[in-house]
Amino acid sequence: MTPPPADDTSGKSGRRTELLDIAATLFAERGLRATTVRDIADAAGILSGSLYHHFDSKESMVDEILRGFLDDLFGKYREIVASGLDSRATLEALVTTSYEAIDASHSAVAIYQDEVKHLVANERFTYLSELNTEFRELWMGVLEAGVKDGSFRSDIDVELAFRFLRDTAWVAVRWYRPGGSVTVDTVAKQYLSIVLDGLASPHN
């Protein structure tokens, strides 16, 4: 009796993931416009035409990279906010999760930071604007609740605090290197210490 043909779904899935990883690295290093399909194919050791067996365009690769990263990130954000932690603990968890994302999805974060302003003009990427709005609502909500319950100072401008947190946390993708001498846990703890407790020593 002839055995049924082997299911190569897992093999195709693994190859697809490998190609996305290669593309993400190139997009992060060179930028989307400067990276061609041929560049990706060359880095993967295949012909350009073979890449189209897996993806119909360069944009579809970018879309899949960003959706995977953002779906995971926002799923964690929503769980944190819904968990019932106090305001300070919630902010700490949001910041830590953000740094963990920079560590785990470094190329995807770099792509997002570099390209989001251009991508949102493309109908395919309208979800990026929606997630930006949700990000603002989640983080602003935590800050406002913290001011109200006394976790955070009442004299802070919540809007400015939000912008400061958003920009200073994510800019770490420019200098943080996964696997380097400084761990993501150390970076997150130092950042939170500076933000929540300040740089100056307590007065005696």
From Swiss-Prot:
Question: What positions does the DNA-binding region cover?
Answer: 36-55
**Pfam families given in the database record:** TetR_C_24 (PF17932), TetR_N (PF00440)
Which BP terms in the Gene Ontology apply to this protein? regulation of DNA-templated transcription
Q: Does the keyword Cell cycle apply?
A: no
Q: Does the keyword Transcription apply?
A: yes
Q: Which UniProt keywords apply?
A: DNA-binding, Repressor, Transcription, Transcription regulation
The record places domain HTH tetR-type at 13-73
Q: Which GO terms describe its molecular function?
A: DNA binding; DNA-binding transcription factor activity; transcription cis-regulatory region binding
**InterPro entries for this protein:** Homeodomain-like_sf (IPR009057), HTH-type_TetR-like_transc_reg (IPR050109), HTH_TetR (IPR001647), KstR2_TetR_C (IPR041490), Tet_transcr_reg_TetR-rel_C_sf (IPR036271)
Q: PANTHER family, per this entry?
A: HTH-TYPE TRANSCRIPTIONAL REGULATOR RUTR, HTH-TYPE TRANSCRIPTIONAL REPRESSOR KSTR2
Function (record text): Controls the expression of a small regulon that may play a role in the utilization of cholesterol.
| Subunit and interaction comment | Homodimer.
What is the name attached to this protein's record? HTH-type transcriptional repressor KstR2
Q: Tell me the organism.
A: Rhodococcus jostii (strain RHA1)
Q: Which lineage ranks, top first, belong to the organism behind this chain?
A: Bacteria, Bacillati, Actinomycetota, Actinomycetes, Mycobacteriales
By which gene is this protein encoded? Answer: kstR2
